[in-house]
Structures are given as structure tokens and as C-alpha cells.
């Protein structure tokens, strides 16, 4: 049965079986969802109800696969799903909204409804979720003094406008209006944030009521510690907690009872796995531990949401980071019951067996794991260095400034900015280039007159010895590795946020190039013909040649084999010999690769971005060192394989903090 055709057929057969009567969006009469405080339970249409839900983030799963993943969740015995709504995903620029295609949250929720799944909606405005800036749009930082997640007037004005766009779209999808949404979360784990601003929570409460109506069931979620609920809970909003499988369940729910003496027990985030960071081992939580703890939670009569049921992928630049600065990788597999690629795991079946002891689990076939195909190796050719492609990457030319400007100041919210100045002194002997205030956010790839010098890295490498003559061009290609998504430092400015020094001199007179890699890749695929043999390539290996090459673009293409049915299929791309960079396939930004740091080695390639009618184009931006160069016989290749590798032993030259405890145990996602 492990074929796409079979999966599609099963989906068509299952949908009518899974749909209950009277599930149309217009059948809203007599539909209610309330709390029965006298019996500590929910009531759905007047009947006792308990939800067992799972988290799925539509923004981390291709729309092409939404139905497949939702069906698998339904067949696991879940009666609801939970999802966040990331503000920055839908309003990337002020007043520019995206609600179509991959951003069509309304379609996603209606699809869940069609499949008989209820919805627990978490619209923020802050979501955390290991997502860039916790879902808050970076353009909020244009007001540098803004206090995020507070009653700061500038912040409230932006939030008010956003909620005025989003929530009216959600209102028709509320359960009482015939839709699937049974509860709506206000903010997210606010008790873990430093501001403790009740005026802010009251403002949100009013706006949610204004837009959604007085009968919608609002709730909050906080870690199962008294200190978190002190600032996270608010009268009139039902307080829930979150905790993982290592927690004392009785003690955790006693914390909820201090805020909610009566009402249903709810764990809004029961952790099935945990998040990863570059340079740390892949997180795993043993299946038997999760299954045993879930059994105990359900035996308490509690409602529970499994976070995550499927993690998915941080495509493009969407990953978040923690403090001390530690960005998350492209994969958000989370060791969840469904893998990053949506495959069934032993954990899936173990949790399904637990659920069937308490609730009825649908009978019938479970949609199978999707087949994978190893397309093999693809040769890539070097196109141009970033320096030589500046006319394409930054057609408007540079911004001039006496001192460095941040990404926000040049309105570059993601990706890369090139900072350029000249050496004010002779550096024939190695001279320290320093960021004394740890002002490189987050990595800077340094070159002098086209000769690679090394990398400055936030919190780890703040000084680098460079050489060059007075008047030589100093370039720093600065990469935004993902904004902090949790804690008091989410106002995470990127770029050079403070001055650099060369020896004892402050560097001035900068030319700043915001790089539009997305437009360049989409508009100029195949347009940068020929290999470059200018001064930059001739010198690229004259200094530190064993460690670095200049950041450069490489491209190649491959065709889907003919004569094999049901192609294209999902695959995984790996980068043997490559170091760190970004990859696009047919203009789709897959995300970051960093096998030199680990633990993720392969990137998930969903089949819907591949084509059979023409060659598929791969574009790679290698930032540190490619496995080939202009002066050697090595061939640059990437390889498509049929198995993921996201748990390699990490390698790092820096001591990395263990962030698995963030606050205490499992308090946070």
C-alpha cells in the first residue's frame, strides 16, 4: 500500500467515513461549547466532552500535504488539532497581508473541519513556537524603544490592527457559528515573560471578545509553576497549564487548580519530544516514557494536547533561537509521532494504542508513509561570488552611513546584508578586527580584497585577526540566523548593531548592501552565465585557503527519471563536503544547511516543489567553504537520498549551552 496512488485512494475513501452528520459550516443551530464548572468538564452541545488533540503548524507543512497529515492525526484517535497563527507569516510588511496558498489558514481550518477534527486556535499575537521572533513581525522594531508584549501604545496599535484583520476571518469558523474552533488562546505563556502587564492581557481580552463575540471560550497556557500563572492568568479567561512526560502529573494539575479551582483539567502542551539546536544532539524522548505519561494524564480525566504531533520544517529563514544565542535548525522534527516528512513512527502507534483505551479510535486504513526516492548525485557549477553578484542581489545600490546600520534600519528583515568599508591602516601583520560589544548578529563572513579571513560569530567569536593593505576593501557578509523567540530578548536586532574596531580604531564610512536573495534566485535562475575569473577568485585561496572560500552561488539541475510511476516523490538533499549555507530548488527556499555543525545533515524536499516537465534547478549559497574550487580537481555535488539524517553527532568549535531545561524541565515550547 506504500504508493502515492494508494494513499490518494485511501484518502478519498476515508473522508466520507470520518465526517459525522451535520458538520457543514452553515449548520450552526444549537451548537455550543462551554465549561461545566460543577462537574469539572467541557460540554459540547450540552454533552460531556473531552478533547485529545495534537499540534500541527500549517506554516511548517506544505499545503500539498495538509490533508495527508490531518487524516493521520484523525486515525490516531485525535478528535481535535491545535495550531498557532504566526503574525509575521501573514503580515511580512506593514499592511501587506498574505492569506492565500501556503498562507491560507482559513482553508486549513475548513479542511480540518471537513475531516471531522475540532480546532484549538492559538492566534497569539505572540506564539513562541521556535519561530522567528515568536511570530511577531520584525518590522515592529522600526520603533526601537518599543516594549513588545506589553501595553506600550505603539505595540498595542500594531496588535489592534492585526487582530482586526485576523479575528474577523476566524469568527465564522467558531464552533457556535458552525465551524471547528472550540477554544481560542489569548497570548502564549505570558507568565514566563518579564513585563507581567495585566493591562496588556485585558486589552487582548477585550479585542478577542469584540471580534469573536461574548460566547467564545478563551483560555491561557502557562508552565505548571505557580510563578508563571501569577502573571499569565487573568480573570475571565480559563487558565490551563503545560508540562511534559517527566512531570509529576498530580502536582502539575494542582498548580492549575490554584488558578481554576473548578473546571476541566487541561494540559495544553504535553511534549512528545523536544526542540533541537545547531551544535547539540538531536532531541529524543523515549516512546515508552511518552506513552506511559499520556496514559496517566488521560487517567486523571484531563484534556490534553500533544505538542507536537507533527513538527514539520522551518523552511527559508523562519527558524527561531534561544538565549544564550542558539538558533534552531531547519528541521522541526521534534521526535514527534509523525516525522518531519509525515511518516508514521513507532511513537504514533504506541500513542494510538494508549488513546484507544480511553476513547474510540476510527477503524480502517491509516494513510501510509509517503514513498521516498533517491535521485542520486547532482553536479553543481560555481556561478558567482556574492561580491560579484551585487548588481543582481542589490540592484538599487548601497546605503551609505558613517556607522553601521542594523537590518531593521535598512528594512531587511531576513537573510543577508553586506557591509563594506576600507582598511584605514596597513595590516601587513595580523590585526584584530573586533566587535567589542558582541554586536555581530549573527554571523559575519569576512574578506579583505576578496581574500577570505574568517568568521565572526555572535557570543562565540568576537575578534578575528585579518591582514591587508591600507585602503583595501573590507567586506562583512552578515547573516541573520533567526531571531530569539523566547524570553525577554525577543527584540532581537540583526546585522552590525554596534561599531567594529580594527586595532584601536573605530571603523567608519560604510556602504551597506541589503541582499534580495529571493528575487535574485527566482528571477535569474540560469541568468548568471559562466564561471567568474576576476581578481576575487584568483585570490580566494591565497589566504586561509584550508578553511574558507568566498561566499558564492553554485547551481545545477537534474531531471526526474522517466518510466517510473508516481514520480516525483519526496526526497532528502545532503551536502557532503559542504559547510554552511542556503539552498533553493526551483526557486523554493528549502532552508539552511550546516552539516559542519549538525545534528541535521539532510533537508526534507517535498515532492510538490519538483517538476517532471523540465529539469529541476538547484541553487546553493555556500557561505564558508565549498568542496570544490577553481584551482582543484574536486567536483561540487549534492546528493538526493531516500532517508533523512537529522541526528548526526554535532561538531562545534565553541562550547554550547544546554538549553533543554529552559526555566525548569518541560515548561516551554
Swiss-Prot record:
Predominant subcellular localization, coarse grouping: other
Basic and acidic residues bias spans: 659-669
Enzyme class: hydrolase
Propeptide: 25-29
GO cellular component: lysosome; vacuole
Glycosylation, residue list: 27, 248, 465, 499, 547, 557
Alphabetic keyword roster: Disulfide bond, Glycoprotein, Glycosidase, Hydrolase, Lysosome, Signal, Zymogen
EC number: 3.2.1.23
Chain positions covered by the region annotation Disordered: 649-669
GO biological process, one term: galactose catabolic process
KW Membrane (keyword) present: no
Binding-site positions, substrate: 84, 130, 188, 334
Coiled coil recorded as keyword: no
Quaternary assembly: Homodimer. May form higher multimers.
Record-stated family: Belongs to the glycosyl hydrolase 35 family.
Its job: Cleaves beta-linked terminal galactosyl residues from gangliosides, glycoproteins, and glycosaminoglycans.
Protein name: Beta-galactosidase
Organism of this sequence: Felis catus
